[in-house]
Swiss-Prot record:
It comes from Arabidopsis thaliana. It is a peripheral membrane protein. One of its GO terms (biological process) is response to brassinosteroid. Induction: Up-regulated by brassinosteroids and gibberellins. Up-regulated by auxin. Up-regulated by phototropism and gravitropism in the region of the hypocotyl farthest form the incident stimulation. Transcriptionally regulated by ARF7. Down-regulated by abscisic acid and methyl jasmonate. Induced by zeatin. This is Auxin-responsive protein SAUR50. It comes from the Eukaryota. Belongs to the ARG7 family. Pfam families: Auxin_inducible. The gene is SAUR50. Provide a mechanistic link between auxin and plasma membrane H(+)-ATPases (PM H(+)-ATPases, e.g. AHA1 and AHA2), and triggers PM H(+)-ATPases activity by promoting phosphorylation of their C-terminal autoinhibitory domain as a result of PP2C-D subfamily of type 2C phosphatases inhibition, thus leading to the acidification of the apoplast and the facilitation of solutes and water uptake to drive cell expansion. Triggers plant growth probably by promoting cell elongation. Regulates branch angles and bending. Effector of hormonal and environmental signals in plant growth.
Length: 107
């Protein structure tokens, strides 16, 4: 049973790394405002941007959120709705108020 849990964790980690890699590669496509590692200049180290809701409001979230099951659930919803090859940044398909409530509980 412990082996299955560990394998599942590794699969989740690989999926999350793939999502972040796709998002960070957007700087190459979009041009300015990015450093040499293709990361947005206004995003502190250890964080990444996500876009939430119909208006695609931008939020900067810590990488530590990736370990929380609630946030992982949002990422899975994003994958189901947009896939990994989405040129509009990491978009979370949920209401902004729901996102704000969830992230305030995680912090």
């Amino acid at each position: 049973m412990a082996i299955m849990k560990k394998t599942s964790k590794l699969t989740q980690t690989a999926m999350l790394k793939q999502i972040l890699k796709r998002c960070s590669s957007l700087g190459k496509k979009n041009g300015g405002g990015y450093d040499e590692d293709c990361l947005p200049l206004d995003v502190p180290k250890g964080h990444f941007p996500v876009y939430v809701g119909e208006n695609r409001s931008r939020y900067i979230v810590p990488i530590s959120f990736l370990t929380h099951p609630e946030f992982q659930s949002l990422l899975q919803r994003a994958e189901e709705e947009f896939g990994f090859d989405h040129d509009m940044g990491l978009t979370i398909p949920c209401d902004e108020l729901v996102f704000q409530t969830l992230t305030s509980m995680i912090r």
